[in-house]
Regions:
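Metal-cofactor-dependent catalytic cores
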Residues: 1-240
Length: 240
C-alpha cells in the first residue's frame, strides 16, 4: 500500500545540536550514516544516560555543525558554529570548554560508531501529524521540533496515522530492493518538542497538545531490515 513520499531527510551528527537537511542519505544497519555518532558526555553524571541534551541545555540546539571530514568513513562534520557565531573545530578543547562553560559542568566529546540513540536508530514522522498539532495548539509548529530522521507526506494527511504502522514494514523507493525498516514502537515525546529550533525558547503548549491529542506520542521508531538509499520525493510503501 503506497503511503506517500519522503518530504524531508534529517541527520543530527552531534546529539541535540542542530540537524542537517539532506536530499539523499544512506540508510545503514545503524540508521542514517553519520546520525548521532557524536555526543557530549557529562563527566559528573554516573547514570546510564550521561549524554548532554537540550533537555539539560536548550541552547545546545543552536550549535550548528558544519563541514565534512573526508577522513572519516561517514563524513562527519569538522567544525561547529556556536550561538554567538564563533567557529571551533569539532574536536577542539575550545569547543569542549565553551559547552562546559555554558552548561556549568565539565563535558567531553564522545564518538560512538553505532550511534547514540534514545530508543531506536531511526525515527519517522508524518507531516499530517505536525499539521494536526498545529491546528489543535494554534501555534506554528516546525517539524524540526520533533527531530525526525524521515518526514513523510502521506496521501491521507491524517494526524498520528503512524501509530498504525507499528509492527509493519516501511519500504522506500520502487520495487522490493530499496531501503526498508520495521516499525517497532511509537515515539513517546519529551520536553524537547517545546523548544524552538531557531531560538531555543520554550513553549510548553506543544507538548501539552501532543499529550491531549495522542497520549504524548507523535511519530514512530524503527529498525533497519534492508540498507539502501533514501531520497527526497521517494515513494514510501507500507508492507506487512
Amino acid at each position: 500500500m503506497e503511503l506517500g513520499r519522503i518530504s524531508a531527510i534529517f541527520r543530527y551528527p552531534v546529539k541535540s545540536m542542530a540537524g542537517e537537511l539532506l536530499d539523499v542519505a544512506r540508510l545503514s544497519w545503524h540508521g542514517i550514516e553519520g546520525d548521532r555518532r557524536l555526543a557530549f558526555r557529562r563527566l559528573t553524571d554516573k547514570s546510564g544516560f550521561p549524554w548532554l541534551t537540550a533537555s539539560k541545555l536548550p541552547q545546545l540546539l543552536l550549535y550548528k555543525p558544519f563541514g565534512l571530514d573526508s577522513n572519516t568513513a561517514e563524513r562527519l562534520p569538522t567544525h561547529v558554529r556556536t550561538p554567538d557565531g564563533k567557529e571551533y573545530e569539532l574536536r577542539s578543547d575550545e569547543l569542549r570548554e565553551e559547552v562546559s562553560s555554558r552548561y556549568g559542568s565539565d563535558v567531553e566529546l564522545m564518538n560512538l560508531k553505532h550511534g547514540i540513540f534514545d530508543e531506536a536508530c531511526i525515527s519517522v514522522l508524518s507531516l499530517g501529524t505536525v499539521h494536526g498539532i498545529e491546528r489543535e495548539s494554534g501555534r506554528d509548529v516546525d517539524r524540526r521540533r520533533f527531530r525526525p530522521n524521515v518526514a513523510i507526506e502521506t496521501r491521507s494527511a491524517e494526524p498520528f496515522e503512524e501509530d498504525r504502522w507499528v509492527g509493519r514494514t516501511l519500504m522506500f523507493g520502487e520495487g522490493n530492493s530499496g531501503a526498508a525498516l520495521r516499525v517497532t514502537m511509537r515515539d513517546e515525546r519529551c520536553v524537547m518538542v517545546n523548544f524552538d529550533p531557531d531560538t531555543a525558547e520554550r513553549d510548553s503548549e506543544v507538548m501539552k497538545t501532543v499529550v491531549r491529542m495522542n497520549g504524548n506520542y507523535a511519530g514512530v521508531y524503527g529498525t533497519v531490515v534492508r540498507a539502501g538509499e533514501l531520497r527526497v520525493g521517494q515513494v514510501v510503501t507500507l508492507g506487512a
